[in-house]
From Swiss-Prot:
This is Urease subunit alpha. Binds 2 nickel ions per subunit. It comes from Nitrosospira multiformis (strain ATCC 25196 / NCIMB 11849 / C 71). The lineage of its organism: Bacteria, Pseudomonadati, Pseudomonadota, Betaproteobacteria, Nitrosomonadales. The keyword Ribosomal protein does not apply. The keyword Cytoplasm applies. Residues 130-568 form the Urease domain. Keywords: Cytoplasm, Hydrolase, Metal-binding, Nickel. Pathway: Nitrogen metabolism; urea degradation; CO(2) and NH(3) from urea (urease route): step 1/1. It comes from the Bacteria. GO terms for molecular function: nickel cation binding; urease activity.
Amino acid sequence: MSFKVSRQTYAELMGPTTGDRIRLADTELMIEIEKDFTTYGEEVKFGGGKVIRDGMGQSQHNHDQVMDTVITNAVIIDHWGIVKADVGLKNGRIAEIGKAGNPDIQPNVTMSIGAATEIIAGENMILTAGGIDSHIHFISPQQAEDAMMNGITTMLGGGTGPAAGTAATTCTPGPWHIHSMLRASDGMVMNTGFYGKGNVSLPTPLEEQILAGACGLKLHEDWGSTYAAIDNCLAVADKYDVQVAVHTDTINEGGYLENTIAAMKDRTIHTFHTEGAGGGHAPDIIAVVGQENVLPSSTNPTRPYTINTLDEHLDMLMVCHHLHANIPEDLAFAESRIRKETIAAEDILQDMGAISMMSSDSQAMGRIGEVVLRTWQTAHKMKIQRGTLQEDTSKNDNFRVKRYIAKYTINPAITHGISHALGSVEVGKYADLVLWRPAFFGVKPSVILKGGMIAASLMGDPNASIPTPQPVHYRYMFGGYGGGIKTSCFTFVSQAALAAGLVDQLKLDKNLIEVKNTRNLRKKDMIHNSATPKMEVDPETYEVRADGQLLTCGAEDVLPMAQRYFLF
């Protein structure tokens, strides 16, 4: 006998279904469910008097035939779609996206629930892949906690702590420092990978860093991003299949943008803070978004362009790059990097999909706990200033949402050779997942999973009789303690380092995963973010044009996902 319920009642009980729409936080972004993998009337839900009980939604199958964990009735937002489904986890990986239940008595079951299965309630929750921040200055280990509590589960970058070199550049220089940081990060509740220093004109100093365990190389102007250094670094990267990230020459001392592009010789490279306020050829580094071999990213202090953006940048820059306000040349260096015209254009290039990634520049002109938040603030600003994208409809912003979520998930994963392991909600990948209440999407996650274990969560008073009494704040859970870190977190290193016996040499607890397939990438491989417009930058007015069109927008004075959610 069937029973008919209203859409509202169904959504309250089982979460939204096909055609239902959800507002993301307090933004103007709306998503619409494209497909529901569950079966009406056969949904699984845990609780007293609910479906997942012995002989009902729970089967008699043994451990090897059932999921370790099922996230029920969740709304998945990923680059490939916006759908509702049950998500099954097995041995720390995503094993199935579909319909969970008891196949002995229920139809359309694609994953079994048994006595060995834990349930995470995903009803009226949004599920995303853990974020990847590929521009980390490892200045303080406490960054990892702030990153995770905004949905970041992987940190790629360089540094050795609060040293002058680390505060300015994302490099972990030399084998001793690389080994030291691999050991030190072994207890961090975070996936990590370290870039070696790429600024040298001969190959052997780079090769020894890759063999020591660097997952990539970083070129930074403060170490000298010369033609010879860029050329040499890319040649070594091609040999060992690791990515190169570059911060180019702001003052055009060793060459201009055209010289840097020539040094690249059409080889794949990741350009950091491509707009230029974070550094790079002044004023036209932003033009590299038109190059097929360049995989460009933004850092979050310029995201999005607001009435406060310019004012805060000068002091940040002086501190981070060891400059002195009483030296005129230092002040001129700083002021040359901060241009409202290129920052405004950056908003639009992000929305066009010409800038492919988002990152933080943590504690070095960027905020590690705001990568996800700033991404969606930018998407909101562009929605209200530029309107609906032509790929979307008046009913939803699904394509725009897929474009923006790819910027901090799948695209940095592809760029840095880790998309075989992480970066999306897809079968076979490690279960680094984040659950959000829609009203808090992008601002404050509810649960963060690492490798299939709950690593962090909002949690109330541990002495209370239930989990919810105040004070409710973020705390590490069991996946963030003891041996849980070993199974739930990973360290990314070069293939050459693994082949050379790094595992036996350092005896790290975390699993080491190789980076691969980084050197044949092109801009077209950046999902939903592959535009290569013809770029022009006026050297006098700093006006930016893409395919002949002037790119400009106003500075916003009010943003969502801001004071409504935070006391401080």
